[in-house]
């Protein structure tokens, strides 16, 4: 029977594994076929199959691939012809040899530096004068009376400038508090600080000092201070004080022909060439609490001291400007004066000749 059995070929699945064909026949023949399909024989068959596939010819055939042909690509000569045609239709624009303003300035002055100019460091104001500090009603009245007597003794002066400023507490919840401090300065060697926290009404001597006919009150945003003082102390009338006061920022714009709104700190930088320490810790401190500490007293004194310094400087500049304008008109006439004035001349410096 064995010689009539046909051995079926093995099948391979997609993974390359060989599956033996179904065994047919009697039990004896099936046992013989199982013995032939032992693991050793299977391993030999797989090794033979791998060796056949790894022959040099088969490897070269698998690796070698036909090179793809170039399609629809122009030859170098055709590309050059296309470029020449485009250049003929749209020739390249020639760069103008004329120098622009920016290139001319760079050529004359050199390439501008990318670094910004560092701001000038100014020295801080150091006040070494006296600070007279009063909190009681009678003390404030006596001090104001002493200042009035000193003003009356200045017989050679028609106007006595007096720096004026105020301080009050501020809260982001409740807003500005009641006027707490008034500081004045008529002489750079002494500043007066009056704390109003205990007062329900301003002393008559202090009101008389503010309304003295020879006193010219000055400060920055001083009109708003007078209006607030009137709201907090109705015995003070703001209108007469506003009429005779001088706002240093407005006066600076008139003399120096500048523009914009000024703060006391900026005026100190521009006019006096000094820096002010406007620390928020002191500026927003409790000005209504008695007594004031040293930092608060120095802050209040410096405000009116530097105000008096700025006033003196602007006063001197105004005199020089008026004198220069008069001399120029006398030498060159009104027409030349108007022409030069239209060009932005401030006449803060002396000008003797002009060419138009």
UniProtKB/Swiss-Prot annotation:
Question: Which cellular compartments is it found in?
Answer: Nucleus
Q: What is its main location?
A: nucleus
Q: Does the keyword Nuclease apply?
A: yes
- Short name of one Pfam family for this protein? DNA_pol_A_exo1
Q: Which domain of life is it from?
A: Eukaryota
Residues in 3'-5' exonuclease domain copies: 155-316
Indicate what this protein is called per its UniProt record: 3'-5' exonuclease
**Gene encoding the protein:** WRNexo
